[in-house]
Amino acid sequence: MAEDRKKVVCIEDEPEMIDLVKLILGRKGFQVVGANGGREGLALIERERPNLVLLDLMMPDMDGWEVYQQMKAREDMKTIPVIIVTAKAQSIDRVLGLHIAKVDDYITKPFGPQELLESVERVLAKVSA
């Protein structure tokens, strides 16, 4: 495995969605690690130290906003960029995410492979700039 591969943690309660993200981003050289739900996701972020987190909002054990708040409250996680990937497609949800919570990007399901890839590359480019 190349050392310069960007590591992405995908926190999602649907294994099929994790597999889809792994397929899309894996083809472009990203290393994707999946977490089934928020609690597992936080533990995985702590262990893996990813370059980026893809975060679902609606999960049964701990919702995405709670995961995001815990990340931003921790010194070792607060600088990791977060892209929300959710079925919550109403404009108010997007405004809350991008302008109130200040997530790095907000993608609604269903999404196209190119949309996901462009978002990930844009956010990572902004962080490394």
PLM regions: where:
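Conserved acidic carboxylate
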Residues: 12
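Charged docking surfaces used in two-component/phosphorelay signaling
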Residues: 19-27
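Alpha4 helix (beta4-alpha4-beta5 surface) of REC/receiver domains from two-component response regulators
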Residues: 22, 66, 89-106, 118
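Helix N-cap/capping motif at the beta->alpha junctions
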Residues: 34-43, 64
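Active-site beta3 strand of CheY-like receiver
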Residues: 48-54
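Receiver (REC) domain active-site loop signature in two-component systems and cognate sites
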Residues: 59
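C-terminal output helix
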Residues: 110-121, 128
